[in-house]
Amino acid sequence: MGNVLAASSPPAGPPPPPAPPLVGLPPPPPSPPGFTLPPLGGGLGAGAGTGRGSERTPGTAAASAGGTADDGACGCLPNPGTFEECHRKCKELFPIQMEGVKLTVNKGLSNHFQVNHTVALSTIGESNYHFGVTYVGTKQLSPTEAFPVLVGDMDNSGSLNAQVIHQLGPGLRSKMAIQTQQSKFVNWQVDGEYRGSDFTAAVTLGNPDVLVGSGILVAHYLQSITPCLALGGELVYHRRPGEEGAVMSLAGKYTLNNWLATVTLGQAGMHATYYHKASDQLQVGVEFEASTRMQDTSVSFGYQLDLPKANLLFKGSVDSNWIVGATLEKKLPPLPLTLALGAFLNHRKNKFQCGFGLTIG
């Protein structure tokens, strides 16, 4: 979707280094104590609606079994979650590539307001500084969820990423995101999502320009067929002067107590993931991607090892391109410090990359 957003923007002269797609905005800073930021891609949390089916996720056998029994007793199916979250459970197991040195300082100014400072030093790209702000409103829907949520991030060149998320009513959530590159307005999009008892529907409008006649429209729908099976689809329509097109994809998700299988099939190719929770400490995932445009396929294996007593989180991965990577996160109580180490090795290109990070607060 990010590529289509970029394609729908009107051509311009040679700008500074291209900004990342709007959909791939950097993750927001951690929320203030006592609150949890909602998923930026949608997905309603607890307390969003009354009498609605609860979303079923793998890894909670007792809760899932109880929820399934209740749904069956009242003739209701569980909510399938959002289309954008179909592959997220597996992707979260894979380590994020690190390079250089990164220092992050988080400071909570109140229960609703937090700021953070990030300095990144790189040997490959440009070093940069980011200032981030997070505000969580007073409309509390659950002990860990409140609205509206405002997240902003600005770097040393003046480029801004900002998002506003708000719960408009039971089951209805909206989001607005903007992106600037120095003094130029690059991207903006508006999302609307409705979560029913057994389905989720979402619409995204990106970079609309009535005068030029360009823009992008994305529609998602996911429906529970059985307590374990959900089916849905995605329609992407983009238009700009001299070009117009639409791409459709179908998706299926099968969920059991401790594993989740998802497949997405469309004109661009195929994407399949498998997530398995082996124990409270170990989770594994397999990802398969096939691109019709690139005529290429790849398979990746990732795992996550969580040792709460040691305050340790380890992630590792290996793929069919012989790229091996790992990250290690270690909390250092009683100090509010988190140490992160990462390394990636590409055997085919004989390239090695490593990084070090420290988070305070």
Curated annotation (Swiss-Prot):
Q: What Gene3D superfamilies does its record include?
A: Porin
Q: Which residue stretches does the UniProt record annotate as biased composition, category Pro residues?
A: 11-36
Q: Which residue stretches does the UniProt record annotate as biased composition, category Low complexity? A: 1-10, 59-71
User: Which Gene Ontology terms describe the biological processes this protein takes part in?
Assistant: protein import into mitochondrial matrix; protein targeting to mitochondrion
Please give one Gene Ontology molecular function term for this protein: protein transmembrane transporter activity
Q: Where in the cell is it found?
A: Mitochondrion outer membrane
* Protein's UniProt keywords contain Chloroplast: no
Q: Where is this region: Disordered?
A: 1-71
The topology of this chain with respect to the membrane is: Multi-pass membrane protein
Compositional bias, Gly residues, is annotated for 40-52
- Name any GO cellular component annotation: mitochondrial outer membrane translocase complex
Q: Which UniProt keywords apply?
A: Membrane, Mitochondrion, Mitochondrion outer membrane, Protein transport, Transmembrane, Transmembrane beta strand, Transport
The domain of life for this entry's organism is Eukaryota
- Record note on quaternary structure: Forms part of the preprotein translocase complex of the outer mitochondrial membrane (TOM complex) which consists of at least 7 different proteins (TOMM5, TOMM6, TOMM7, TOMM20, TOMM22, TOMM40 and TOMM70). Interacts with mitochondrial targeting sequences. Interacts with TIMM29; linking the TIM22 complex to the TOM complex. Forms a complex with BCAP31 (via C-terminus) which mediates the translocation of components of the mitochondrial membrane respiratory chain NADH dehydrogenase (Complex I) from the cytosol to the mitochondria.
**PANTHER family found in the cross-reference section:** MITOCHONDRIAL IMPORT RECEPTOR SUBUNIT TOM40
- Task of the protein: Channel-forming protein essential for import of protein precursors into mitochondria. Plays a role in the assembly of the mitochondrial membrane respiratory chain NADH dehydrogenase (Complex I) by forming a complex with BCAP31 and mediating the translocation of Complex I components from the cytosol to the mitochondria.
Q: Which family does it belong to?
A: Belongs to the Tom40 family.
Protein name in the entry = Mitochondrial import receptor subunit TOM40 homolog
Species of origin reads Bos taurus
The opening ranks of the lineage are: Eukaryota, Metazoa, Chordata, Craniata, Vertebrata
Q: Which gene encodes it?
A: TOMM40
